[in-house]
Amino acid sequence: MATIADSLHTGREMQHADPRAVLTGTHFMNGDAAACEGALAAGARFGAGYPITPSTEIVERFAARAPQVGGLFIQMEDELAASITLQGMVWAGQKAFTSTSGPGFSLMMEHIVYAAMTETPCVFFNVQRGGPSTGLPTLPAQGDMMQARFGSHGDYSLIALVPNSPQECFWLAVKAFNLAEQFRVPVMVMMDECVGHMTEKVVIPKAEEIEIFPRRSPSKKPGEFLAYGEIGEDLVPEMASAGEGYKIYVTGMTHDKRGYPLGNADAQRTLITRLFEKISRAEDELTLIDEDHMDDADVAVVSYGITSRVAERAIQLARAKGLKVGRMRLKGVWPFPEKRFREVAQRIKAFVAPELNMGQVVLEVERCAGGHCRTIAMPHPGGTVHRPLDILAAIEKGARA
């Protein structure tokens, strides 16, 4: 994968990564470290965080690496402070992120939706662990998938990516920052403990092979520019930075093109509709599925993160037995690729959906199937992973549907 720019079709001139920040070469590193390197390559120069297992290694590495490229890390007093501090730095012109896990992710919900409402481009890494509450701090789960999309109050839309390897942690970190800038939304990178802590080969290319989506700088002079007034065909406004002479008003209240609060239904309808449509219009672009053997499939295995690696073995075993089974590995979960799943549901017998939770993304799969095919959930409370033979049994069940 030499570039992640293929899906960025907005007509804006792409930039390249800063060579000072890119550790070009072949490395042996874990997913947390690779995510940090992806953030640096994407241009992140500010990180804020609070230590929490199993995500601590992301900010620990960033704290050491950022000063080498003119960046800064601040360990905050808690996740609340971290998740709002990074947004201040974004409005000051920086690319910024935080990282956390379950309990910290819960604390960040208010500020995630604040970023969605104010259209603040930023990235949240969530290295999921067993829950609820304190749960299993050192063991894997995928129980925060619905929380990533619906965890806060009100109506909003955002993007969530799901890597399944350290190599993909690097590339999806880069992509997360690009998508955050392209759509002016918070982007979640939903890792899990296994992916975050597994150590594998990670190939980092040269800086000129890493394309970066630039900040949408104002096209008008100070005095003429409106904070949310210069909106392109993609429904995403230009963004001014504090300290550049522009008048910027940022509020979590329903607001107009100036950013000023407006307390009426018309303003609410205009704003919320645009926040949704800037994502929904890009459904094809944001459909990120790694598919294999889907041309002749009777059964499609839907998985993501560490579970997809276990599922791959089950698919191999099934095809060796002559079963027509394909892979639909989600690299992007939100927005959910509804169009593609509705298409597939028309021609297969069953979806099989293993997850390290009690059934979350499978609900979207079942909704999109619309009764055209069977949906077989494979819930798992976490702490370990599925057995390939159990997934194989579910595939065989689906093939008999």
What are these regions (language model features)?
Residues 43, 156-157, 324, 347:
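Short loop/turn motifs at secondary-structure junctions
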Residues 2-31, 181-401:
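Flexible, low-complexity linker and terminal segments
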Residues 54-57, 83, 105-107, 131-134, ...:
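Flexible loop/turn segments at secondary-structure boundaries
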Residues 74, 158-161, 326, 376:
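Structural signal for short hydrophobic segments within the conserved structured cores
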Residues 146-190:
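Internal, well-ordered domain-core segments that constitute the primary functional module
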Residues 1-150, 157, 174, 193, ...:
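Thiamine diphosphate
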Residues 97-99, 123-125, 160-162, 188-190, ...:
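Structural motif
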